[in-house]
């Protein structure tokens, strides 16, 4: 038997939406000296950490003065921000990773640092160079359907009768699928008072200001035009030349900008080899 829940029921839930990855993160924090949580801006990284790890102090590298102190006076920075410490947007001052390495190497404690950031590839590279073997890495994406509808069942699929019977206890009929697809999966959009068009307008402005200005030399209007062109091609085969023609820049520039969208968690390219593998399995 299934239970039908509409989005009205979703909006009435408590402001914080329980994330399925939480038990994994708690386990990793308890067994690792340092944990890194990556994911695009506003998927809920900071909210999750602040809600689930309340004993951690917090430093946010979106703040310029905080970054400056971490870079120029790391000893004073750690004196002002003792462990356990959560450092948000750590990729903005990656030099601190060397200081973190020194601290964790001098201690046997677990759960000393939680780091988060929205530039996945830069962080992975920095971790492999500075904190290899000392950090556990997890990725947070947007809300899943189970998270949106408050389904507590959170086990990976196993083709057994026992799994099916347990899963049937919480079967939910998802209403308004197309509305959810159109709206997206950012947690803030599931606040009943949030206008999604205004939200995405602000999101793009923040993304251009905080991330793109640091990664690419392009004016905001041209890059916004590029974002629009890419969004219109969601689910299609990627044609760099076609996008370059629409935006009015070179094909190499488009390739570079696509890689930036991937690095910041905005797009997820699927390689043609994956598509071919799926076709082979289907055959």
What label would you give each PLM region?
Residues 6-14, 273-280:
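Conserved small/polar residues in nucleotide/adenosyl-binding loops
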Residues 16-28:
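Pre-Walker A adenine-sensing motif
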Residues 37:
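Hydrophobic anchor at the beta1->P-loop junction of P-loop NTPases
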Residues 45:
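Conserved lysine of the Walker
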Residues 48:
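Hydrophobic positions on the alpha1 helix immediately C-terminal to the Walker A/P-loop
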Residues 98-114:
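Conserved catalytic/switch belt of AAA+ P-loop NTPases
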Residues 122-135:
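Short regulatory helix/loop adjacent to the ATP-binding pocket of P-loop NTPases
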Residues 150-276:
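Interdomain hinge/linker elements that couple catalytic modules in large macromolecular machines
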């Amino acid at each position: 038997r299934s239970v039908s829940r509409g989005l009205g029921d979703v909006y009435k839930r408590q402001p914080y939406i329980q994330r399925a990855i939480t038990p994994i993160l708690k386990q990793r924090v308890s067994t690792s000296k340092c944990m890194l949580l990556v994911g695009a801006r506003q998927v809920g990284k900071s909210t999750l950490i602040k809600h689930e790890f309340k004993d951690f102090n917090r430093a946010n590298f979106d703040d310029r003065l905080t970054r400056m102190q971490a870079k120029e006076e790391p000893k004073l920075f750690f004196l002002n921000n003792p462990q356990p410490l959560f450092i948000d947007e750590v990729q903005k001052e990656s030099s601190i990773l060397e200081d973190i390495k020194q601290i964790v190497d001098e201690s046997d404690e677990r759960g000393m640092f939680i780091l988060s950031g929205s530039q996945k590839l830069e962080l992975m590279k920095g971790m492999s160079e500075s904190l290899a073997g000392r950090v556990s890495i997890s990725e947070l994406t947007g809300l899943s359907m189970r998270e949106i509808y408050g389904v507590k069942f959170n086990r990976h699929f196993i083709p057994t009768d026992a799994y099916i019977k347990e899963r049937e206890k919480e079967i939910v009929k998802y209403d308004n699928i197309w509305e959810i697809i159109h709206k997206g999966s950012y947690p803030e959009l599931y606040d009943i008072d949030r206008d999604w068009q205004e939200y995405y307008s602000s999101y793009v402005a923040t993304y251009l200001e905080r991330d793109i200005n640091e990664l690419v030399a392009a004016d905001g209007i041209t890059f916004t035009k590029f974002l629009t062109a890419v969004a219109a091609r969601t689910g299609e085969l990627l044609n760099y030349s076609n996008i370059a023609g629409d935006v009015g820049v070179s094909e190499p520039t488009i390739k570079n900008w696509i890689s930036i969208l991937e690095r910041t968690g905005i797009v997820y390219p699927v390689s043609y080899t994956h598509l071919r593998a799926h076709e082979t399995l289907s055959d």
